[in-house]
Amino acid sequence: MGKTGNDRKSRSTRAAGSDGTLIKKEYLILFAIFLFAIFIRFYSDPSIPYHYDPGKNIVYAHAALDSFPLVPQVNPYFNLGEYYEYQVLFPYTVAFLSKITGLSLVILTSWLAVLTGAALCLTVYFLSRELFGNTTAALVSAFLIAVSRIEILGYVNYYPQIMAMTFIPLAALCLIRYVKTERFGYLLLVAILSALIVLASYLTALVYFLVILIALAVWCLREKKSAISLLLIPLMIVALLTFFWLPIIWRHGIQSFVDIATGDILTPQISAFTNQPWTLASFLSYSSATVIAIGLGICALLLYRKMPWKMEWDFPKVLLTVWLAVSFGLIGSYLFYPILWVDRYFQFFDIALLIVAGFVIAFIIDKLNALKIPAFRYKGYLVLLLLMIPLYGAVHSDTTFVRWGYPSDMEMVEYMQTLPAGSLVVAPPGIQGFWFSALSGVHILGGESAQMIGQHYSGEADSDTIINSPNVNQKMDLIRKYGVNYIVIPYHGNNYAVWNRVLNEEGIDAFNNSLYFAVDKYFSDSSGSTVLLKVKENLTPAYAPEQVDWGITATGYLISIVTLCGFGYFWYSRRKQEKGS
């Protein structure tokens, strides 16, 4: 994995080009790739962000607006109030941008997901250039990331993970520079970026830490280096995130986290780490870029006998090898035990593989250009024509992103914004509840209580019973229990790949009871209708808002702020000392 051609010079050149231009041509190419990545993501998913999880993320953004500028601890919009302890960075960023721009949460959610996802090609470019010192390789990898169908697949749901993945190459770059220079500033950047990855997506962070800690351990053992980095990085992250984890620990206790880790994540057959029906074979068939990368790797073996792995193993090579091995092993784990949610974590392997693919393509280009056969000078660049294959796959994707929302649903959302403040609404569980709450700001009975630590809340199941039970007395018992004021029923056929929950017709017919229910509003469209029922009994929602310990919260923020300032002062002192010497 050495340097090729004149690319060794690229790392030491200044921002200005050799011809006197203000911006080097590779940055112009990179910017064009970034713009194309933005375009292809909107083009591939015209329904963005009306999918499953994004509606939930927008509800969390509403909660973040309520607690701004603090990171929210409570989400009042689901389950009569719940703790807010899951993937906070993306919705908080949406709320922050809404505060300073005044734009809607839906628009900001769409653009933040696309921009952070497209920015992955930028962070991959800089990591690749750090790894190989080869501008061509870095640009090819950036392009492959821009058109990778595996990366585009994330837009169906996983916006927080998209953000976390974009931080990972930057964190890896800073870690490489820290190992090379042992400068505290790079270590601090690793800690800050790692903390952001944790806040963005816990599960992404878990795999990320697995990769970097194994790589550091292998490097320390191989070079007989001090293992202090293995301890420093986690300790610095824990200190920086005190504002976030301390209130959670105070509420639930350490044992709850142990139970969650062993009982809900690692061991059960159905969990956040349970494999979907995606296998390594399906990954290969889905990603043409992967097939090209593997094929070109074989070609590189034939072109060059003295392979890069026979060279001196430095930390960048160790890190990239561990990244490939761990992510590939997790994909292949489906053959032995379902430990990974593959449709999310294919991205780890995809990123590492496409970084290597960029280098292999640049290597083959150099070797072909060096061949003394009759042809034009830059014959090696014909290899770049292979990039048309993943480009075609991205532009002509056969993946359908199922969306939410018929015209009558949208009209109902607008009407529901006029409901009395604090009204409690029942909607069909899952995506319907997410989006009616996200767009109208109403409080919904239900949500995803499975993500709450220490809660045994049945609002989601009870919402389903209220809507679908044919027994009106059973409906009313639950309605009185929670103090429900309204019931929204989207009643459509499954047309045009629009998400719609199947409803029990007998359960819907049971609402034709004028003693308990009245139609408050009704909208229809060519596919069906959306009706809002008012509960005739004047009930008060049985809110039991979760309590925030402001003393513990203030302590957590104080520790995090003092820690960050202390790290900053230590870095400044070290830098000043280095300049003085």
Model-found features: residue ranges?
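Membrane-interface helix-loop-helix junctions at transmembrane boundaries of multi-pass membrane enzymes
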Residues: 21-24, 182, 222-232, 296-328, ...
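Transmembrane catalytic cores of multi-pass membrane glycosyltransferases
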Residues: 53, 159, 196-307, 339-340, ...
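Alpha-helical transmembrane segments
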Residues: 215-216, 297-306, 359-363, 561-576
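Aromatic-anchored segments of alpha-helical transmembrane domains
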Residues: 39, 146-150, 194-199, 238-244, ...
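Hydrophobic/aromatic-rich transmembrane helices and adjacent perimembrane loops
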Residues: 161, 338-368
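Extracytoplasmic
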Residues: 5-8, 63, 119-122, 131, ...
